[in-house]
């Protein structure tokens, strides 16, 4: 497939607001293309380049892309606004003639170049990435350059969300949408179904991460027990959730975003080899940093995952402990549809030191449950999760089978803009605009702003990330692609005409950076509204 064909298709998708038309265009692409070619074309169209479980990254910032494009087009780097950059590429490259004998770009060729960019490491890697970027952009026509630039920075803005891809796949292969949805939860993403030529998989596959089952929030432990009845309470650990895949001595770890994080965890791999009595297994657990039996702050734990290459000293400085709480696959048998109590019972015979099971209590008594939760809090944990005893494991679903109860009001929000601070903080972008997700429109709606809660080291890290994610600057303000998720505590939620969302957090404070969460896992505007309405009812009592 020529890149020109894909770019023209992208422009047709961009020109229509009709979901039906978008589905028709994407399904036609899938039908008429070789599975591997369609797989790569969809990754480019959606601005992913690599699927969620692939740990590779391009590491190409807007600044790098601008440098390459401006050297080819003669554009002056007057800003870093995404729209202006694309406009510059389209207009200025359009005025240049491509050599008559130059071979047209293909999707396969471009994808190989992108793979080579992701593999550039070590001294001179930046220059190598720039040289590789020059190859396609020097030959691209305006439409090809438009698609390629936006795909590289993950901003194609074609409205091709996962739901639309699922519909397109179902239409292309004549499958039921519900079946495609189920397969996506097990395989982790829709791209893999296209790569398989429409072949669906409903059972867990070893070394292929599933989407994690998620918990909804409950206002109190008492209301959670009232809703679920007799249930299991588990400690809610303040750590990094991991999916553990084991076959013999081969062990791999996947984050809740389905990224392969095995290289960061050589010490934990050894724990699994000695502490999991199974030939083959897929387990769910939580990693925490511990010292003298107590959890260390999340900010310390996350340092183990911030480097592309693990510093061996961090293994001793930040010792990790794995706690297991669920079983998905055991020696070829799927446990997805087995009830929670049966999965937990099986785990009791599988897990031994140095791995541990998350502490659990089965009860229908709110007072007994409160004692258990207070014990969890005293030991330095976040709270508890209440789990329905007969619940199956449903990948990718945030349902009412699991209810989380925490001590403080908090939301997971996304940074969409920031301002430089004052005084000592003038070096950093340290005042953050925080947004909740609107699942209907795909927008992120601002619900507050804060500069509180972070260390100087974290200000430095976020400032660097924001520069990489920039889509425009106005004075001290930087607007960014919504990628950084933070956990935010607050006193209450108020109605406010200041923001499009209609809400504003009072006394917002960032409690931690959630590197392990994707923007799609951020709290929704509906959740914000729900908390606000419960506050109002409470005040009226």
Curated annotation (Swiss-Prot):
The active site is at 236 (n6-amp-lysine intermediate). One of its GO terms (molecular function) is DNA ligase (ATP) activity. Its EC number is 6.5.1.1. ATP binds at residues 234, 241, 256, 286, 325, 398, 404. Its cofactor is Mg(2+). GO terms for biological process: cell division; DNA biosynthetic process; DNA recombination; DNA repair; lagging strand elongation. It catalyses: ATP + (deoxyribonucleotide)n-3'-hydroxyl + 5'-phospho-(deoxyribonucleotide)m = (deoxyribonucleotide)n+m + AMP + diphosphate. Keywords: ATP-binding, Cell cycle, Cell division, DNA damage, DNA recombination, DNA repair, DNA replication, Ligase, Magnesium, Metal-binding, Nucleotide-binding. It is an enzyme of class 6 (ligase). PROSITE patterns: DNA_LIGASE_A1, DNA_LIGASE_A2, DNA_LIGASE_A3. The keyword Heme does not apply. Pfam families: DNA_ligase_A_C, DNA_ligase_A_M, DNA_ligase_A_N. PANTHER family: DNA LIGASE, DNA LIGASE 1/3 FAMILY MEMBER. HAMAP family: DNA_ligase. Belongs to the ATP-dependent DNA ligase family. This is DNA ligase 1. It comes from Korarchaeum cryptofilum (strain OPF8). The lineage of its organism: Archaea, Thermoproteota, Candidatus Korarchaeia, Candidatus Korarchaeales, Candidatus Korarchaeaceae.
